[in-house]
């Protein structure tokens, strides 16, 4: 195939086929605002919405001050072998226990020079959203973070004819679809931003 548009269409179909069964799609988001605060040049919101037919999730959304619509970014948090926080690695959390805030601040300091990517982008005119990947942060094990259990569950996904990494890819795509519905967002200018470890998630 020499035509790039045709190649992209065929390649995408091949990748999606390899990703096995997707979680059920929904547009019945039933968004609930859990908390809000004003930051310097932008507003921070903590939302809850239906990401899939299976999962209702919490997310942080940052919206620049001023008149939109704005370009928008889905922030994919890193793996890092650190499961106690997810979206909080990308956007500085609020309305959380001090332990969570301290955890997030320490991670940002150790891995990102003290800079939260989401807060930086929002201060420069982008709407941003970040959601915990399955098993991270508020979607983690209630028994506590355990990397070996994460590996076990990845194997369980395979036994059920699914792929955990592909499941995350689908949720990333669904998050992008949700982001594009927000009134402050220009749906033609949405992109993904990721740290090094989940870079494969941006390819689909």
Predicted regions and their residues:
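Conserved small/polar residues in nucleotide/adenosyl-binding loops
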Residues: 193-202
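Alpha/beta-hydrolase fold nucleophile elbow
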Residues: 185-192
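Cap/lid segment of the alpha/beta-hydrolase catalytic domain
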Residues: 77-170
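N-terminal pre-domain segments of enzymes
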Residues: 1-16
């Amino acid at each position: 195939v020499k035509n790039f548009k045709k190649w992209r269409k065929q390649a995408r179909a091949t990748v999606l086929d390899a990703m096995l069964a997707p979680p059920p799609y929904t547009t019945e988001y039933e968004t609930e605002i859990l908390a809000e605060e004003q930051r310097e040049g932008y507003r921070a919101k903590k939302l809850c919405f239906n990401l899939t037919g299976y999962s209702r999730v919490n997310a942080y959304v940052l919206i620049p001050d001023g008149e939109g619509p704005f370009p928008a970014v889905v922030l994919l948090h890193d793996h890092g072998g650190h499961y106690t926080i997810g979206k909080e690695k990308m956007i500085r959390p609020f309305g959380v226990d001090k332990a969570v805030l301290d955890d997030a601040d320490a991670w940002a300091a150790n891995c990102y020079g003290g800079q939260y990517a989401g807060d930086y982008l929002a201060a420069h005119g982008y709407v941003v959203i970040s959601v915990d990947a399955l098993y991270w942060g508020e979607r983690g094990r209630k028994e506590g973070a355990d990397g070996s259990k994460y590996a076990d569950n990845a194997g369980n996904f395979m036994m059920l004819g699914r792929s955990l990494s592909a499941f995350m890819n689908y949720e990333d795509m669904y998050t992008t679809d949700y982001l594009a519905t927000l009134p402050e967002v220009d749906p033609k200018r949405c992109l993904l931003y990721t740290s090094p470890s989940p870079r494969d998630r941006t390819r689909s």
